[in-house]
UniProtKB/Swiss-Prot annotation:
Its EC number is 4.2.3.26. Binds 3 Mg(2+) ions per subunit. It catalyses: (2E)-geranyl diphosphate + H2O = (R)-linalool + diphosphate. Transmembrane segments: none annotated. The Asp-Asp-Xaa-Xaa-Asp/Glu (DDXXD/E) motif is important for the catalytic activity, presumably through binding to Mg(2+). PANTHER family: OS04G0344100 PROTEIN-RELATED, TERPENE SYNTHASE 10. Mg(2+) 2 binds at D319, D323. Residues 1-24 form a transit peptide. Belongs to the terpene synthase family. Tpsb subfamily. The gene is QH1. It comes from Artemisia annua (Sweet wormwood). This is R-linalool synthase QH1, chloroplastic. It is found in: Plastid, Chloroplast.
Amino acid sequence: GNAYMRIYSTKTTRITANATVNAADTHVRRSANYKPSSWSFDHIQSLSSKYTGDDYVARANTLKDAVKTMIRKSGNSLRTLELVDELQRLGISYLFEEEISNLLETIYYNYYKFPENWNKINLNLKALGFRLLRQHGYHVPQEIFLNFKDKNQNLNSYLLNDVVEMLNLYEASYHSFEDESILDDARDITTKYLKESLEKIDGSIFSSVTHALEQPLHWRVPRVEAKWFIELYEKKNGMSPTLVELAKLDFDMVQAIHLEDLKHASRWWRDTSWDTKLTFARDLIVENFLWTIGFSYLPNFSRGRRTITKVAVMITTLDDVYDVFGTLGELEQFTDVINRWDIKAIEQLPDYMKICFLGLYKSINDITHETLANKGFLILPYLKKAWADLCKAYLVEAQWYHRGHIPTLNEYLDNACVSISGPVALMHVHFLTSVSSIEEIHQCIQRTENIVHYVSLIFRLADDLGTSLGEMERGDTLKSIQLHMHETGATEPEARSYIKLLINKTWKKLNKERATVNSESSQEFIDYATNLVRMAQFMYGEGDEDFGLDVIKSHVLSLLFTPIQGI
């Protein structure tokens, strides 16, 4: 089923295939034994931040002006790339989008567009520029790195003393497309070099290398990275006190907006009454909200965070209906009602399914109404289809389970890319961008079909990889790891390696697609979609037993409840 909240609890196995519900409902339904929420409604509503006053806004504006002056003074030199990188990693580049856009355009035409200019750039800035320019949609070919190896295919000896250079080349290599062998070699060589260098380095460079080897920057969640990088950058030689102060202040001011979004979502959750009327429903409003910060932490995405939290909660609840509580007969009826989207059809459903359908029906209609009021177009047909597709995919998994069918890995993944819930979540995201015409959004939906598929595939594989073997043994459906073992006779470590390889290959396809679908109206959506992948890889780890509730709780406290500058 769905991945959003799998890691917070372990489900019991599904009810048996021959379980039926008669008029007296003699079948005893299993509870999934979920833990109660760590945060009560009253606690969430009591949260507040002092970083909302006019004084903070005024100070932030003064600091922004100072940074704009820094950017102007840096000119169009290649060194300016380091400033752009710092602004991005500190989480404040969104405040200087126009300045950064102009800078990168000038630097691209001066140094990167024409091969005859490449020899003016040292490897460090080649790698940094390559990463930033590809990230921003510029075409920079892999051949820019042709001479980083000697004729024996080893690293050129003059590179062997510069860890920062190797680190930048390592990070650049994760922006590769399929069949870019120069970048593949760069990744292999730099990974080996950086691992070996750990014994010889210390301080902030040691922290940076360890961090990068755990996960490359391109795969990291921007908000989580900002929290980490602010603390690292503050201790760095030559750091800018202006950047540090602005990054901290902005982090705390934006966190205050997130708190209001969370409180809004929490009130909505209470109003659904699902936590009291649906005994199996999980109260995971805070954890679900954390996902939305992964989509976008920016202040102007408030409506998006509030909407996506509702979507994630509804996905989690439907997942429990299909995975834990419903009999196969009930699930087939329920899927039919969702497909018809007809309130009159709910008479045939058991009471808990009526409550579930009515909650979904009302919430989707409310979202539709809000979009109609704000943007002037009707999105219900798009949303109805996305939710029906999700429920059909859930039903397929339930049918496989009840019939004892073991799908092939490809058969599983075709369905699991839908049941992971990426397509339904991203369909909602299409209508939360700043694009204001339904024609443009329709074009964007068509243009980004491959992106949605690749994002959903990595989302699914990351979820499966994050399922430890113990959890799989307790769980109710086969995952891609087990299916690969079943098909090929591979061991569990071999199967995990294969899934990681698939994730790597799919990232390359996603990178290519991001570069190809380079229209302004799609860019915002593409960034949100890529952030969903990053959030999935962040939330699921790689099957570590300890990656559970306590880890997530610490992230919630760090990102949502604790200001950097203190309370």
